[in-house]
């Protein structure tokens, strides 16, 4: 009897519960007597504390987080479900077949081994998921799981970041974390989110420094395979940082103080390092001072006439070892023309320089533009998108230089420049553009120079949501 009274004393009557007032648990309670209410205890007592989450609710939460936009990144998910192995493996194969030659990290065999043996290791899983996201984003494609669920690069990026936030803050400087940041940077650059992309790049560069990979002596105790991977990653980040320096006007921190990766004897042409090593040469011939001068919009004291001559002479041609009109060749070709035109612009600021790359030599932009057009004639259009915003941005840089100088030509040279500019613009506007502001600035510059753009329809950007400073190497 005593137990029954204690149990009743802990339960509020129906009226007090609805009115949200204190109940003494008596039958009838004093509150009901005072207000002439019929005191009953018909509703069952509810368990105190937070309610348990039903499976249906968990599934719905996961669906919403997968479908949401970039804002989802800042919120940790309620549940954690790994991307299926088979789906990741499909992405790894796509990476090997299309992208390794452009940004080489690990071969398919090495990646597949990691997937099979260390799938449950969080750091390895995050890297493989980020690599899959970057692959789908670079190729602008999507992939379906066995359950017919479609995944895009954006969705995989969000899943990867959500998982990282749930289990770790990514402060660890192990090689997988650095590669995860690099791959996420590529994915977000492709979906036109330059600020997030640049922040992720900075995180990777910071971890490179924390791990001591900017010092050659750090590599001495590593195996050849470990050295190769870290050297490749170091130079991928160095090139990325130098690209951002120009368009986000930020100083660089990495320098070519580390030996590049060595050539490897391979039978699979997709694993050739030739084009990557040539790309490293293209980005390191100018030197750190060149990019810092462009970032500051001023001439650096260490950026001399001799260094600009070196850029012009050494980047005039590309290595004969590179297969023409391949993915690797396209990356090298446009980067080479782009850096040469930037060197010419820097010389333009250094008026009075008396050497072959003289600012008064108006033929130089025409020559660079012609070289670029030759490289475009036999290149399939679908190969440009693999490189993201890099190709259209570099093309617009060359076109802008022509617009800047066309008014200074005599009649004959002006006619020649206009014809070349017409062809360059026609090619530039055939590409998918990610940088809204740069495209508008170029169009305005042409209008101010009374130049009619050779396009038959209004300017349109591709289908992605735009960030005003969307760029990518």
Swiss-Prot record:
Keywords: Activator, DNA-binding, Maltose metabolism, Metal-binding, Nucleus, Transcription, Transcription regulation, Zinc. GO terms for biological process: carbohydrate metabolic process; DNA-templated transcription; maltose metabolic process. It is found in: Nucleus. InterPro entries: Carb_Metab_Trans_Reg, Maltose_ferment_reg_DNA-bd, Transcription_factor_dom_fun, Zn2-C6_fun-type_DNA-bd_sf, Zn2Cys6_DnaBD. Signal peptide: none annotated. SMART domains: GAL4 (SM00066). A motif (Nuclear localization signal) lies at residues 46-54. PROSITE patterns: ZN2_CY6_FUNGAL_1, ZN2_CY6_FUNGAL_2. Pfam families: Fungal_trans, Zn_clus. One of its GO terms (molecular function) is DNA-binding transcription factor activity, RNA polymerase II-specific. Residues 13-39 bind DNA. Its main location: nucleus. The keyword Nucleus applies. GO terms for cellular component: nucleus. Regulates the coordinate transcription of structural MAL1S (maltase) and AGT1 (maltose permease) genes. Belongs to the MAL13 family. This is Maltose fermentation regulatory protein MAL13. It comes from Saccharomyces cerevisiae (strain ATCC 204508 / S288c).
